[in-house]
Regions:
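Terminal, compositionally biased segments used for targeting/anchoring and flexible tails
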Residues: 5, 75-76, 93, 110, ...
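Long, contiguous interaction/recruitment modules in multidomain scaffold/adaptor proteins
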Residues: 1-38, 143
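Alpha-helical repeat scaffolds
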Residues: 32-36, 71, 104, 137-138
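TPR/TPR-like (Sel1-like) alpha-helical repeat modules
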Residues: 98-115, 138-143
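TPR/TPR-like alpha-solenoid helical repeat scaffolds
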Residues: 20-26, 114-139
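Short coil loop/turn residues that delineate tetratricopeptide repeat
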Residues: 45, 79, 113-114, 120
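Alpha-helical adaptor scaffolds
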Residues: 21-25, 37-95
Length: 143
């Protein structure tokens, strides 16, 4: 019995530590969102900050706001395959498969080639089983 109690205590300590770590991560994320938001108020086209802010908004689950950032990045960097890839992810997270597939195709046309990551990226879960997604991979993966 004492052994089971010890395991239980260790588990609760681990849970508390994990909760503290998650809380610290969220506090850091909130800080960054505020900090980078202020920078963008002064310089709305600061590409490096936009990239970080878009990623942070997505991590926070604020997908619609992340989409707006990703759209702006594509406007600022129309030939950047990563900007298009991130925009495709935003569309997929918002369950907009037509736009996600179209934008993902554009990312690949512009040179995005990390197909292994594309297959595993959780942001693309909503389109992973779409025949157009599989077709896109078949078309470009071996070129």
């Amino acid at each position: 019995m004492a052994h089971q109690g010890k395991q239980s205590n260790e588990g609760s300590e681990h849970t508390s530590t994990s909760s503290l770590a998650r809380s610290a991560d969220q506090n850091q994320l909130d800080f960054e969102l505020d900090f980078y938001g202020r920078i963008l108020e002064r310089n709305p086209n600061y590409v490096d900050v936009l990239r970080v802010q878009g990623n942070n908004l997505t991590r926070k689950g604020r997908f619609a706001e992340g989409l707006q950032i990703d759209k702006r990045l594509v406007q600022l960097r129309p030939a950047d395959p990563l900007a298009h890839y991130n925009l495709a992810c935003s569309y997929a997270l918002l369950k907009r498969p037509d736009q996600a597939i179209k934008t993902l195709r554009r990312a690949v046309e512009l040179g995005y080639r990390d197909f292994r990551y594309m297959r595993e990226d959780r942001d693309l879960d909503s389109i992973r089983h779409d025949p157009r997604f599989r077709q896109l991979l078949r078309e470009y993966e071996n070129h």
